[in-house]
Curated annotation (Swiss-Prot):
Gene giving rise to this polypeptide: panB
Pfam families, per the entry: Pantoate_transf
Protein name from the UniProt record: 3-methyl-2-oxobutanoate hydroxymethyltransferase
Binding residues for 3-methyl-2-oxobutanoate: D51, S52, D90, K118
Originating species: Xanthomonas campestris pv. campestris (strain ATCC 33913 / DSM 3586 / NCPPB 528 / LMG 568 / P 25)
Keywords annotated in UniProt: Cytoplasm, Magnesium, Metal-binding, Pantothenate biosynthesis, Transferase
């Protein structure tokens, strides 16, 4: 467990300080109090209540059916037990379609206990990010493979190869300029993710984006080797197999992120 996690709760400014200090950030999803409590006690710095709950908890084929009410319910359950980890919650599909709708949904999530909201995509979402930050709501920008755009992408595919990598770099910088305090990069080639991470002043969290990011996140079911009913992505590693228990798996995952052994080339995408 990191020295920070041993001493005091994480805050948004502390995330930027961790990047400056070269300290890797450990993030996991959680959707209920029991797992959240275990993750919080075993070295996880940030917990994401993700709309991935639509697939791994509710059994849907995508995240699209998840509602703001679903997100509020699970966010509140997780928030009640956290002592150190910073809590991030997703804005569900189309909850951020306009700045006003995003403010309503984000307000509900913060009232439920979230400390930051995550928004997928760039483009017109930059206005949403700016609108929320101007109203004192911390924002995480999710770029690369954005699951809410799965229909447009034609499936879950690596993003940012070739010329698209340069656009991804521009999108990441634009999100930070709009006020984002954290960037999630999903299914992005390792060299591009590393370049983006080096260029930005805020931390990047990778999921299938290689070891050059400032931290890593996995869906808890993937980290524990549970069958989610969907094809396992290349970047997934079962830490329960080596950890022997849920707490042991979390500790093994956290240590691997911090010492840089996860993700390795086997769990990342080349250019």
């Amino acid at each position: 467990m990191s020295s920070h996690a041993d001493s005091k709760p994480w805050t948004v400014p502390a995330l930027a300080q961790a990047k400056r200090d070269g300290r890797k950030l450990v993030m996991l999803t959680a959707y209920d109090a029991g797992f959240a409590r275990t993750f919080d006690a075993n070295g996880v710095d940030l917990i994401l209540v993700g709309d991935s709950l639509g697939m791994v908890v509710q059994g849907h084929e995508s995240t699209l059916p998840v509602t703001t009410a679903d997100m509020v319910y699970h966010t509140a359950a997780v928030a009640r037990v956290l002592e150190r980890a910073l809590l991030v919650a997703d804005l569900s599909f189309q909850a951020d379609a306009t700045p006003e709708r995003a403010l309503d949904a984000a307000t509900q999530l913060l009232q439920a206990g979230a400390e930051m909201v995550k928004i997928e995509g760039a483009g017109h979402k930059l206005d949403v990010i700016r609108y929320l930050v101007e109203r004192e709501i911390p924002v995480c920008s999710h770029l690369g493979l954005t699951p809410q755009s799965v229909l447009r992408f034609g499936g879950y595919k690596v993003q940012g190869r070739g010329e698209a990598g340069e656009q991804l770099r521009r999108d990441a910088q634009a999100a930070v300029d709009a006020g984002a305090s954290l960037i999630v990069l999903e299914c992005v080639p390792t060299p591009i993710a590393a370049q983006i991470s080096a260029e930005l002043r805020v931390p990047t969290i990778g999921i299938g984006a290689g070891p050059g990011c400032d931290g890593q996140v996995l869906v808890m079911h993937d980290m524990l080797g549970l069958d989610s009913g969907h094809r396992r992505p290349k970047f997934v590693k079962d830490f329960l197999a080596e950890g022997g228990s849920v707490a042991g798996a979390v500790q093994a995952y956290a240590q691997a992120v911090r010492d840089g052994s996860f993700p390795d080339a086997e769990h990342a995408y080349a250019a």
